[in-house]
């Protein structure tokens, strides 16, 4: 079995979309296993930029089957528009290329309204939600009252479940947040219309389809969204997303056993970024941070928000390697660090006068740490035209070698630009 999980090893926005698109050349299938339209995966092919939020990043390769698994929360109006844009630009011409699980949870307009109302009510304690309704939709799934993708195709059941949901949601919106309410008839009309458009992609049991594909020798990539440090259980809670972003969730969401996974690839930037609130030990609130932000175009593809930037944090990265069981690493945006006299790498933290090398479990402790920085000589050469590893300047290879020795996990892929061709391979993705 050739299952490979691709997981974000930082706070998201590591470049997983580009990597999945590159990997998909050698894969038969890409499975998106968690999150929702809060993800923004940017792909650049032949100079054309495509931003995906729900559709798996393998969709730009016509021969690759893409699956949205049970653990994803789907805004049906958003995915309808995303599919239309793909079709209008020449992609997804065959509906059999995209399969959507019947048991995936729906994000409905009242989820987004609740998300926005709650964030506004938090005042100074904002989490930094994207306002896409992700959290409220996952809440409904956990409380066993979610409306699923398959419900769209059963009008009577959809009406019954929607009316029950609105009894609670409208009460909350009106009485707790003084907001507008929703009418069941209007929502049902809109949902039935979008159901017709999405019907060609409906798949009752994606778990069975994925399992059969793996057993027949197909190469399957599992695409995560966000990053390890945003995991609901093992991230910097409460400054996290509402799903498990770890590699282990690929199996649970897709409905396969862990023995199906051959390797776990952790994706990280050559520096660190974070969007929204929460601790960020290596954050640079100076001209260097602004330069990294500008050179890396560090603005969210989903929200447009600027990303906080800082030096690479090896304490957090080693934590991600441990909790995911990462076997191989991919370093993205190495080209962005061109032009710095020296490059900082955080190798430890100082907390209350003591040096620590393990990530604190409390975000409030993490907020107090001071990064212990080691300095590596920088380089001035433009890396975006580099075609082979041997063409990299010596200071750059020294940086790569230093990180590899510190992390104890091989760096197999290095990205030096947004395009497919700007990818350097140390070792092939699949073993066979």
Curated annotation (Swiss-Prot):
Recorded catalytic activity of this chain's protein: IMP + L-aspartate + GTP = N(6)-(1,2-dicarboxyethyl)-AMP + GDP + phosphate + 2 H(+)
Pathway where it operates: Purine metabolism; AMP biosynthesis via de novo pathway; AMP from IMP: step 1/2
GO annotation, biological process: 'de novo' AMP biosynthetic process; IMP metabolic process
Cofactor binding remark: Binds 1 Mg(2+) ion per subunit.
Active-site annotation: 13 (proton acceptor), 41 (proton donor)
Amino-acid positions noted as binding GTP in the UniProt annotation, renumbered to this chain: 12-18, 40-42, 307, 333-335, 415-417
Pfam families associated with the record: Adenylsucc_synt
Binding site for Mg(2+): 13, 40
Superkingdom in the source lineage: Bacteria
HAMAP family: Adenylosucc_synth
Role played: Plays an important role in the de novo pathway of purine nucleotide biosynthesis. Catalyzes the first committed step in the biosynthesis of AMP from IMP.
Similarity comment: Belongs to the adenylosuccinate synthetase family.
Name listed for the protein in its UniProt record: Adenylosuccinate synthetase
């Amino acid at each position: 079995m050739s299952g490979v999980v691709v997981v974000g090893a930082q706070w998201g926005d590591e470049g997983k979309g580009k990597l999945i698109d590159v990997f998909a050349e050698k894969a038969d299938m890409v499975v998106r296993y968690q999150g929702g339209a809060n993800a923004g995966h940017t792909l650049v092919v032949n100079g054309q930029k495509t931003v995906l939020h729900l559709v798996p990043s393998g969709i730009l390769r016509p021969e690759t089957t893409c699956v949205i698994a049970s653990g994803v929360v789907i805004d049906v109006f958003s995915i309808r528009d995303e599919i239309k844009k793909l079709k209008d630009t020449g992609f997804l011409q065959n509906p059999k290329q995209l399969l959507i699980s019947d048991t995936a949870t729906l994000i409905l307009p009242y989820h987004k309204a609740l998300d926005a109302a709650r964030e506004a009510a938090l005042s100074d304690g904002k989490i930094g939600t994207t306002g896409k309704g992700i959290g409220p939709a996952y809440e409904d799934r956990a409380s066993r009252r979610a409306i699923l993708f398959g419900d769209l195709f059963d009008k009577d059941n959809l009406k019954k479940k929607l009316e029950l949901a609105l009894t609670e949601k409208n009460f909350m919106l009106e009485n707790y947040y003084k907001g507008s309410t929703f009418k069941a008839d209007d929502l049902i009309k809109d949902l039935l219309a979008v159901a017709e458009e999405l019907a060609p992609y409906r798949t009752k049991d994606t778990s069975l389809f994925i399992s059969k594909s793996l057993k027949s020798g197909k190469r399957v990539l599992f695409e995560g969204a966000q990053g390890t440090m945003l995991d609901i259980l093992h991230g910097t809670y409460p400054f996290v997303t509402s799903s498990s972003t770890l590699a282990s969730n690929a199996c649970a969401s897709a409905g396969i056993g862990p023995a199906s996974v051959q390797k776990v690839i952790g994706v990280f930037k050559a520096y660190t970024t974070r969007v929204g609130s929460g601790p960020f030990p290596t954050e640079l609130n100076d001209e260097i941070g602004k330069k990294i932000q500008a050179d890396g175009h560090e603005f969210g593809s989903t929200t447009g928000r600027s990303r906080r930037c800082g030096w690479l944090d090896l304490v957090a990265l080693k934590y991600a390697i441990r909790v995911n069981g990462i076997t191989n690493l991919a370093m993205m945006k190495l080209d962005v660090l061109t032009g710095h006299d020296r490059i900082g790498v955080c190798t430890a933290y100082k907390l209350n006068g003591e040096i620590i090398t393990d990530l604190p479990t409390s975000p409030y402790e993490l907020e107090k740490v001071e990064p212990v920085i080691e300095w590596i000589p920088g380089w001035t050469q433009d890396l975006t035209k580099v075609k082979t590893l041997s063409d990299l300047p010596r200071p750059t290879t020294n940086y790569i070698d230093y990180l590899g020795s510190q992390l104890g996990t091989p760096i197999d892929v290095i990205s030096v630009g947004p395009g497919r061709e700007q990818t350097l391979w140390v070792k092939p993705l699949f073993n066979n």
